[in-house]
Amino acid sequence: MDPRSEVLLRQRHLFATPLLLAGLPADDLLAELPQAQGWSWHAGEQAQLDARFPGRSRFDTRAPTGAWTSAVLFLPKSRELTDYLLASLAARLPGGELFLVGEKRGGIERASKQLAAYGKPRKLDSARHCQLWQVRIEQAPAEPDLHALAQRYSLPLADGELQVVSLPGVFSHGRLDRGSALLLGQLQALPGGHLLDFGCGAGVLGAALKRRYPASRLTLLDVDAFAVESSRLTLAANGLDGEVIAADGIDGAPRELAAIVSNPPFHQGVHTDYQASERLLQRAAEHLAPGGELRLVANSFLKYPPLIERHLGPCRTLAEGDGFRIYSARRS
């Protein structure tokens, strides 16, 4: 059981009425709280919840509607996303109770101050290195417009400016990260055909690929619903076509790909987690057509070349700078 869920269950007497659990982990919490429904924006956790508790959790960027008397937000990493989620939940709870639970190292003390916009926050419990806070919604706000919260910026590329639309919670929100900047300069001479932007975030790499290879079919994949929505907005802002899918890792990607291009993810909430990146290297060959290429950016200190060569083929370093390297390998 997730420690945050354990803290909630210590106070289960507070959750006897219809309850919405936002950002809930894929553990036994829904079994322990049969009156609760879930709202998830993580495709992997949603798939696990669907398998165990069919129909009891929804995958979306917007809060589900329902006759909730209270809601719990499991604190996400992003402050901007927390603001949006709290406002979304508060809008559904006039006169109701809004709870916030999170790890101390995840910033729950700081985040509890964000509850003050809706009433007087109270700390209810502290255990398992987590805290539980509560506020009664004195005045419910209007439901926030997610798209109005987007940050938009332009990238000057060789073939013209690219418009990027970034929603709260998306990696490197509102700016281009250094790894992607390096990879954008190394998109030349990719095989033609079906291209995948794996871990697409706001869709920067995918949009640049479609601009550079307009005849190619494009798929963008991310585990996060807000990233999926951001990528769709970025493609639309540039008049580009592409399929954007939500999936937990490379296993959810299409097969017979001409190329996989990636700035792979390495965070799961507040924790560093290289599992999705390592699984990409281990399974890329299964999703590439013969002669297909994996091209990715990674921190220089990560020992990826041996893993790439073990599972795919000879690994070349195409570029290096700012603490990052661009690796390339082809399926034989």
Curated annotation (Swiss-Prot):
SUPFAM superfamilies: S-adenosyl-L-methionine-dependent methyltransferases
Chief site of localization: cytoplasm
Highest taxon of source: Bacteria
Protein name per Swiss-Prot or TrEMBL: Ribosomal RNA small subunit methyltransferase C
Disulfide bonds: none
CDD domains registered for this protein in UniProt: AdoMet_MTases (cd02440)
Function: Specifically methylates the guanine in position 1207 of 16S rRNA in the 30S particle.
Reactions mediated catalytically: guanosine(1207) in 16S rRNA + S-adenosyl-L-methionine = N(2)-methylguanosine(1207) in 16S rRNA + S-adenosyl-L-homocysteine + H(+)
Keyword rRNA processing: yes
Oligomeric and partner information: Monomer.
One GO CC annotation: cytoplasm
Compartment(s): Cytoplasm
HAMAP family documented for this protein: 16SrRNA_methyltr_C
InterPro entries: DNA_methylase_N6_adenine_CS (IPR002052), Mtase_sm_N (IPR013675), rRNA_ssu_MeTfrase_C (IPR023543), RsmC/RlmG (IPR046977), SAM-dependent_MTases_sf (IPR029063), Small_mtfrase_dom (IPR007848)
EC number(s) on file: 2.1.1.172
Family affiliation: Belongs to the methyltransferase superfamily. RsmC family.
Keywords: Cytoplasm, Methyltransferase, rRNA processing, S-adenosyl-L-methionine, Transferase
One term of GO molecular function: 16S rRNA (guanine(1207)-N(2))-methyltransferase activity
